[in-house]
A protein has these predicted regions:
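Short linear sequence motif anchored by a di-proline
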Residues: 1-243
């Protein structure tokens, strides 16, 4: 599950995907859930466009742009839910994501780098993931639009897709190990559900954005480990700059 990433600048997006901002608002330089960031989708004419929207899908019947669960019984209060990631195994059936999936509202989320927690030392150490060739990542995603019932504002929003990474030599090392709810002992590796973002090559952009559901699913695969430049996050001594 990814909850932080760094978007590229607009020049890098134009070079990689041949699409520009075209009067879109600016975006956050360090993305966290519910921040505003860029994503690439097809417009009504099936042409790529760069859109700026909220990271975190908003349920269509939500009263607020903060994703909340619906009360299940009398006296139960809504709870905030996480919609920044969607599992490819269940995206077709989850209420927040299924409509966008069925309607082919697929997008690409540009990322210069993203971050995942590593617990091998017994505590959380954030790792940063870049491409070894210096190009930006293209993260497979879904998009939607939500209309604010109070103001009528249309809010584009998006999520990133994930898949199981138990077999990946790098991504299986990320995230806190799951434990047995009864014994509290770590589950064996084959019982863990390690996750990875679905990462697309630029050459596959048209297939992802404009292909059938079947052709899009063919792109849901783990990324070869040699494409990664990954390691513990390093901050400069001045200003907390990421290196």
């Amino acid at each position: 599950m990814c909850t932080r990433y760094i978007p590229p600048d607009v020049a890098a997006i134009e070079r990689e995907w041949h699409v520009g901002r075209h009067n879109q608002p600016d975006w956050a330089r360090d993305m966290h859930p519910l921040y505003t960031g860029p994503f690439i989708r097809l417009d009504a004419g099936k042409t790529r466009e760069l859109v700026v929207g909220q990271w975190g899908m908003i349920p269509g019947d939500s009263d607020t742009r903060i994703p909340m669960s619906k009360p299940r019984g009398p006296g139960e209060k809504p709870k905030r839910i996480s919609t920044v990631n969607a599992r490819t195994e269940s995206v077709h059936s989850r209420p927040t994501f299924s409509s966008a999936w069925r309607q082919g509202q697929r997008c690409i989320v540009p990322a210069a780098s993203f971050f995942e927690p590593n617990w091998e030392s017994g505590k959380n150490v954030w790792w940063r993931f870049k491409r070894a060739d210096g190009r930006p990542w293209g993260v497979a995603g879904l998009w939607d639009q939500w209309t604010d019932p109070a103001t009528g504002e249309i809010v584009p929003n998006f999520t990133m897709l994930t898949l199981n990474a138990n077999a990946h030599p790098l991504m299986k090392r990320m995230h806190r190990p799951e434990v047995d709810p009864k014994t509290k002992a770590p589950l064996p590796p084959e019982k863990q559900d390690k996750r990875s973002l679905v990462l697309l090559e630029a050459a596959d952009a048209d297939q992802w954005l404009n292909g059938s559901v079947e052709s899009a699913r063919a792109l849901v695969r783990l990324t070869p480990v040699e494409l990664f430049d990954a390691g513990p996050e390093v901050q400069a001594s001045q200003g907390g700059l990421l290196l």
